[in-house]
Structure formats: structure tokens, C-alpha cells
Amino acid sequence: MSSSTIKTLAVAVTLLHLTRLALSTCPAACHCPLEAPKCAPGVGLVRDGCGCCKVCAKQLNEDCSKTQPCDHTKGLECNFGASSTALKGICRAQSEGRPCEYNSRIYQNGESFQPNCKHQCTCIDGAVGCIPLCPQELSLPNLGCPNPRLVKVSGQCCEEWVCDEDSIKDSLDDQDDLLGFDASEVELTRNNELIAIGKGSSLKRLPVFGTEPRVLYNPLHAHGQKCIVQTTSWSQCSKSCGTGISTRVTNDNSECRLVKETRICEVRPCGQPVYSSLKKGKKCSKTKKSPEPVRFTYAGCSSVKKYRPKYCGSCVDGRCCTPLQTRTVKMRFRCEDGEMFSKNVMMIQSCKCNYNCPHPNEASFRLYSLFNDIHKFRD
């Protein structure tokens, strides 16, 4: 091979390398679309690797790059393999993420799946979180709709609301004091559902809701209608130790739509000494405060600020300690690549110890199914 040919090949390789580097660098100025892209159900918006534009986060086993990052909130990262110059990689779960079990199947950390046509679920470090694919079934029907009911539509998975136009419309003001409950609502209670119908179009309160409903007039609601605002209590934490998930259902929003809210919770750190801190003669240690400020972690990201949270302790007589009073704090998290997001986090104020334990023995707890939910969690 002649020297001129070798030089030509060397120049070509150099130009190719420079081209790849140029494509992988960030622009001097950001130019983003006026409207954020619309993502598939369960897919969130994240900033690209240059910190410029919001893009739909890539999911497990999808191609990724600097401009198409993976979904950090699900514990995914872009794996470029052994190549240091690769421009594209594949979204993989971080190694520390734990798999999930659902319906006798194992799903990897960061994996998304549909257990049925009405839910889209994702495994996040041992916990399964789901979003509804039929939101119209969860929303409250128009309060001017007499005797509304959900009906199946041929060829569709989701049911739709229909109204009984032949019924006489009663005045809402005359029905505000007709709140009640009957046995037919037991199944709805089990499913954490809220419904605003009944005989004579009376508005009813289900016992799953811990507080009395309040009627609000909000000009943002459709046609300026009244909204019966109801919110369930937060469910118990999905894990007895370590980071878990707590949920509740509410329609306290501008559209009066029934939505599920989640928050991160930690009853106690895993590996917390059980009996070493008990005083002489004491059988329980109700509440313990972190000895030093710590950062909360979620999906491989850490809280921006440090906190000194309280945790629930343990007992030696078979009782278990669970949160009694809590509050919810919106917390900012930062990932290693600079991506930031906010999550609601449970902060314990006090704990109680009794024999009404969510599972027989916290020390031997391995598998826990969250009541009123379709999820399973594994430590």
C-alpha cells in the first residue's frame, strides 16, 4: 500500500472521528419547539443531555443518546457498552435496582408492561407502579347528568359514561344534605373508587374517604358547576423498611377529576437496630430521629437538600410501630447527569405501636401486597 493511500485513509478516519464528535456535542444556542412533545402513557418528559429541550424519555431496551436520554425516574441509564466513542446506546436498568413480581411473573427494574388493557405499569426498584389507560372511567361524570353509568363499548377496552335523559333532574342545592351510604357501595369501597350518583341523584360519600366532603364552586370547573371534593387517606407504606410508595385518591383539582397521587415513604431504614436502643424496662421504641442530616434517594437520584427525618421504631413484645401522624413534602431530586425532578415525600411526625400489624412479623417480612391496589412489592 502506497504512502499516499495510507495518508488518504488516515485523513478519512480523522474526518469521520471529528464528524462523530461534532454530532455528539451540544449546540451553542438551544432551539426547542414551542410545544412540548406528547408522550405515550407512562412515559415522562425529561431534558435532553444538553439541558436544552424537553423530550420523551426513552424506556427499557430502547435506543438512547445524548439528545434522547433514558427515563431516570425509572432507574434507567444509557449503556454505551465498552465503546468510549459510541453515539448511541441502549437504555438499561441500573444494577442496584431490584426486580418485581406481579401475577407470578418477574419484571426487571425499569421494565414497563401492561397487565391488562386498562393499566400501564412499571417496575421501579422492587415496586410496581401503574397508571390508568382509561382515565374517563376514573373521572366524575357531569353533575348535570342524571343517573350516570359506565357501559361497555363494542370493540373497545374502556367503558364510557352515559346519562339517563328520561329521568327528572333534581336540583343540586336540594340534595346537598342527602349524603349517605348503602351496601351496594361495598365493592366500590374495596376498589378505592369515588362515585357521585345514587337514588334521586343524591351525592354520596363512600366510607373509604376519611373526611367529610366539601362542596366548592370553582369557576374553572366546566359550566361553573359545584364539585364534591373528597380525598382518601394515604395508604400505608408499601415497605416495612427502605423506600416504598404510598397512594391516595382525590378529585381536589380544577377539573374535579378523580386522580391517584403517590408519595415516597420510608417507615424505617433497612438494617436499623431493633432492640439495642431500648431503655431498661421499655418494650417499645416508638419514634426515632435520624442522628444526622441525610439525603433521600429515589431511582438513583438524591434529594437536593439534607433532612433529619423521623422513623418508627420497634417492640420486643410482638407489637409493631407504624406512622400515626405524617405530612407530605414536595422534594427536589438531582441525578448524576444534572437532571432534576420533584416528588412528594412522606415525613413522619409521630408513630404508634400496637398489635394490629399489617403483617405478622416485621423482621421476617418478605412479600407484601398493598391493600386496595393491584401492585405487589418485594423487599
Swiss-Prot record:
Q: TSP type-1 domain spans which residues?
A: 226-271
- The signal peptide here is 1-24
Residues modified to Phosphoserine: 184
Gene Ontology MF term list: extracellular matrix binding; growth factor binding; heparin binding; integrin binding
Which SUPFAM superfamilies has this protein been placed in? FnI-like domain (SSF57603), Growth factor receptor domain (SSF57184), TSP-1 type 1 repeat (SSF82895)
BP terms from Gene Ontology: apoptotic process; apoptotic process involved in heart morphogenesis; atrial septum morphogenesis; atrioventricular valve morphogenesis; cell adhesion; cell-cell adhesion; cellular response to angiotensin; cellular response to hypoxia
List, alphabetically, the InterPro entries matched. CCN, Cys_knot_C, Glyco_hormone_CN, Growth_fac_rcpt_cys_sf, IGFBP-like, IGFBP_CNN, Insulin_GF-bd_Cys-rich_CS, TSP1_CCN
Give the family this protein belongs to, as stated in its UniProt record.
Belongs to the CCN family.
According to UniProt, the name of this protein is CCN family member 1
